[in-house]
Amino acid sequence: MENSWHIHLIRSRRRSVGIRIEDSGEITVRAPLRMPEREIRQVLESKRSWIEKTLAKISSRPQLPKLTAEEVNALADRALKEIPPRVAARAKQMGVTYGRITIRNQKTRWGSCSAKGNLNFNCLLMLCPEDVLDYVIVHELCHRKELNHSPRFWAEVAKVLPDYKQSLKWLKTEGQTIIGQIQN
């Protein structure tokens, strides 16, 4: 196994091995309590190509300065002012209802929608282009019709934003650079 990999092993009651690569390049491996280390190494070896590709992608990303707590709070305040009216307008356009709107500082999600219709949005959306912000809002509101990512769900997104794939691509390529600005 590659010596330059920084691996953090967490044992838990899970049934399978999970691998997560942090922006720092640290690899977090979650494995069943009784799984032998040999088997964990085999899983890592089988995922070597993906791990190396992901690590290369991380190291090639531009390193933006970390946001201070004050800057994150300012983004959250701005998001609290700007996102709810946009959600209300899109919900009316789409004919859907929703519950509470919460603004959070998250490292893994841009938005989410609960089964009760409560919406969560990442304050870092304030650093994204407007069309990307609109895409995330529409994406979450479409979950009010389809609480999954089935073809029907994506058809709902496309009805409202026919070119949504451009915003989705932007999030996948540029989003991690923005999320990388959060202090650990």
Q: Model features per residue range: what roles?
A:
Residues E140:
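Walker B catalytic acidic pair
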Residues M1-Y135, R144-N184:
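Active-site-proximal or metal-binding-adjacent scaffold patches in catalytic folds
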